[in-house]
Amino acid sequence: LDFTIYHIDQGSLALHHETYPENIKATLQPISFAENIHREQQSKVLLDFKTPIHTGLSFRTIEAVGYRKKLITTNIHVAEYDFYHPDNIYIWDEKTFDGLDEFLESPYHELPAKIYQKYSFRNWVNYVLNIPPHIVIGLPEADS
Protein backbone atom coordinates (compact mmCIF):
# COMPACT_ATOMS: atom_id res chain seq x y z
CA LEU A 1 0.00 0.00 0.00
CA ASP A 2 1.44 3.32 -1.09
CA PHE A 3 -0.73 6.01 0.39
CA THR A 4 0.47 9.56 0.98
CA ILE A 5 -1.66 12.54 1.99
CA TYR A 6 -0.53 15.95 0.82
CA HIS A 7 -1.03 18.63 3.47
CA ILE A 8 -1.17 22.29 2.52
CA ASP A 9 0.21 23.64 5.79
CA GLN A 10 2.17 22.71 8.91
CA GLY A 11 -1.00 22.76 11.03
CA SER A 12 -2.70 19.96 9.14
CA LEU A 13 0.60 18.09 8.91
CA ALA A 14 0.96 18.25 12.71
CA LEU A 15 -2.48 16.65 13.13
CA HIS A 16 -1.77 13.92 10.59
CA HIS A 17 -0.31 11.37 13.01
CA GLU A 18 -3.21 11.90 15.43
CA THR A 19 -5.71 11.22 12.65
CA TYR A 20 -4.22 8.54 10.39
CA PRO A 21 -2.53 5.16 10.94
CA GLU A 22 1.26 5.06 10.65
CA ASN A 23 1.22 3.32 7.26
CA ILE A 24 -0.42 6.40 5.71
CA LYS A 25 2.39 8.84 4.94
CA ALA A 26 2.23 12.63 5.07
CA THR A 27 4.00 15.26 3.00
CA LEU A 28 4.10 18.99 2.37
CA GLN A 29 5.73 18.40 -1.03
CA PRO A 30 3.23 18.34 -3.89
CA ILE A 31 3.78 15.89 -6.72
CA SER A 32 3.72 16.93 -10.35
CA PHE A 33 0.70 16.36 -12.56
CA ALA A 34 2.72 13.84 -14.58
CA GLU A 35 3.71 11.92 -11.43
CA ASN A 36 0.09 11.90 -10.26
CA ILE A 37 -1.06 10.47 -13.60
CA HIS A 38 1.72 7.86 -13.47
CA ARG A 39 0.65 6.80 -9.97
CA GLU A 40 -2.98 6.54 -11.04
CA GLN A 41 -2.06 4.37 -14.00
CA GLN A 42 -0.05 2.04 -11.74
CA SER A 43 -2.82 1.80 -9.12
CA LYS A 44 -5.44 -0.92 -8.89
CA VAL A 45 -7.88 1.24 -6.93
CA LEU A 46 -8.36 5.01 -6.68
CA LEU A 47 -9.73 6.78 -3.62
CA ASP A 48 -12.10 9.74 -3.64
CA PHE A 49 -13.15 11.51 -0.45
CA LYS A 50 -15.98 13.97 -1.01
CA THR A 51 -15.45 17.38 0.52
CA PRO A 52 -18.35 18.94 2.40
CA ILE A 53 -18.36 21.96 0.09
CA HIS A 54 -19.64 20.16 -3.03
CA THR A 55 -21.95 17.34 -4.03
CA GLY A 56 -20.84 16.84 -7.62
CA LEU A 57 -18.23 14.51 -9.01
CA SER A 58 -14.53 15.03 -8.57
CA PHE A 59 -11.99 14.59 -11.35
CA ARG A 60 -10.83 11.47 -9.49
CA THR A 61 -14.15 9.82 -10.34
CA ILE A 62 -13.83 10.65 -14.03
CA GLU A 63 -10.20 9.51 -14.00
CA ALA A 64 -11.27 6.17 -12.52
CA VAL A 65 -13.72 5.70 -15.39
CA GLY A 66 -11.18 6.74 -18.02
CA TYR A 67 -8.36 4.59 -16.65
CA ARG A 68 -10.73 1.68 -15.99
CA LYS A 69 -9.81 1.62 -12.30
CA LYS A 70 -11.88 0.61 -9.35
CA LEU A 71 -12.92 3.52 -7.13
CA ILE A 72 -13.63 3.78 -3.42
CA THR A 73 -15.58 6.97 -2.72
CA THR A 74 -17.61 8.65 -0.01
CA ASN A 75 -19.77 10.40 -2.62
CA ILE A 76 -23.17 8.66 -2.57
CA HIS A 77 -24.30 10.61 -5.66
CA VAL A 78 -21.94 8.63 -7.90
CA ALA A 79 -24.53 5.82 -7.92
CA GLU A 80 -26.89 8.07 -9.90
CA TYR A 81 -24.59 8.24 -12.95
CA ASP A 82 -24.70 6.01 -16.03
CA PHE A 83 -21.14 4.77 -15.48
CA TYR A 84 -21.87 3.42 -12.00
CA HIS A 85 -21.42 -0.31 -11.54
CA PRO A 86 -21.07 -1.86 -8.05
CA ASP A 87 -18.15 -4.02 -9.23
CA ASN A 88 -16.24 -0.85 -10.13
CA ILE A 89 -17.30 1.68 -7.50
CA TYR A 90 -17.55 1.05 -3.76
CA ILE A 91 -19.47 3.75 -1.92
CA TRP A 92 -18.07 3.88 1.59
CA ASP A 93 -20.43 5.13 4.29
CA GLU A 94 -17.45 6.11 6.51
CA LYS A 95 -18.71 3.72 9.20
CA THR A 96 -18.30 0.12 8.12
CA PHE A 97 -16.38 -1.75 5.46
CA ASP A 98 -19.13 -4.28 4.74
CA GLY A 99 -18.57 -5.71 1.28
CA LEU A 100 -15.16 -4.09 0.74
CA ASP A 101 -13.25 -7.39 0.59
CA GLU A 102 -15.67 -8.75 -2.00
CA PHE A 103 -15.43 -5.51 -3.99
CA LEU A 104 -11.63 -5.63 -4.05
CA GLU A 105 -11.59 -9.31 -5.04
CA SER A 106 -14.13 -8.97 -7.85
CA PRO A 107 -12.88 -8.15 -11.37
CA TYR A 108 -13.39 -4.76 -12.96
CA HIS A 109 -16.61 -4.70 -15.00
CA GLU A 110 -16.03 -3.28 -18.50
CA LEU A 111 -18.53 -0.58 -19.39
CA PRO A 112 -20.01 0.07 -22.84
CA ALA A 113 -17.59 1.89 -25.17
CA LYS A 114 -20.09 4.78 -25.42
CA ILE A 115 -19.65 5.46 -21.68
CA TYR A 116 -15.86 5.71 -21.97
CA GLN A 117 -16.28 7.99 -24.97
CA LYS A 118 -18.86 10.15 -23.17
CA TYR A 119 -16.59 10.78 -20.18
CA SER A 120 -13.37 11.17 -22.17
CA PHE A 121 -11.42 14.41 -21.92
CA ARG A 122 -11.93 15.11 -25.63
CA ASN A 123 -15.72 14.78 -25.34
CA TRP A 124 -15.79 16.88 -22.18
CA VAL A 125 -13.93 19.74 -23.91
CA ASN A 126 -16.12 19.46 -27.03
CA TYR A 127 -19.27 19.43 -24.90
CA VAL A 128 -18.27 22.41 -22.75
CA LEU A 129 -17.22 24.43 -25.81
CA ASN A 130 -20.19 23.16 -27.86
CA ILE A 131 -17.92 21.77 -30.58
CA PRO A 132 -19.56 18.98 -32.59
CA PRO A 133 -19.47 16.11 -32.46
CA HIS A 134 -19.96 15.52 -28.78
CA ILE A 135 -22.08 13.46 -26.43
CA VAL A 136 -24.17 15.45 -23.97
CA ILE A 137 -22.96 15.02 -20.40
CA GLY A 138 -26.03 15.63 -18.28
CA LEU A 139 -26.54 15.47 -14.57
CA PRO A 140 -28.64 12.64 -13.15
CA GLU A 141 -32.31 13.41 -12.74
CA ALA A 142 -33.17 14.54 -9.21
CA ASP A 143 -35.79 12.51 -7.38
CA SER A 144 -39.09 14.36 -7.31
Predicted regions and their residues:
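C-terminal "capping" alpha-helix adjacent to the active site of nucleotide-linked donor transferases
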Residues: I91-L111
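Conserved beta-strand scaffold positions in the cores of enzyme catalytic domains, especially
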Residues: L71, I89-I91
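Nucleotide-sugar donor-binding catalytic core of glycosyltransferases
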Residues: L1-H54, T73-V78, S120-A142
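Short glycine/proline-centered loop/turn elements that form peptide/ligand docking sites
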Residues: S58-R60, L71-D82
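Short alpha-helical segment that forms part of, or immediately flanks, the ligand-binding pocket
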Residues: I37, R60-G66
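A short, well-ordered alpha-helix in the C-terminal region of glycosyltransferases
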Residues: Y108-N123
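Acidic, glycine-centered active-site loop in nucleotide-sugar glycosyltransferases
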Residues: F83-I89
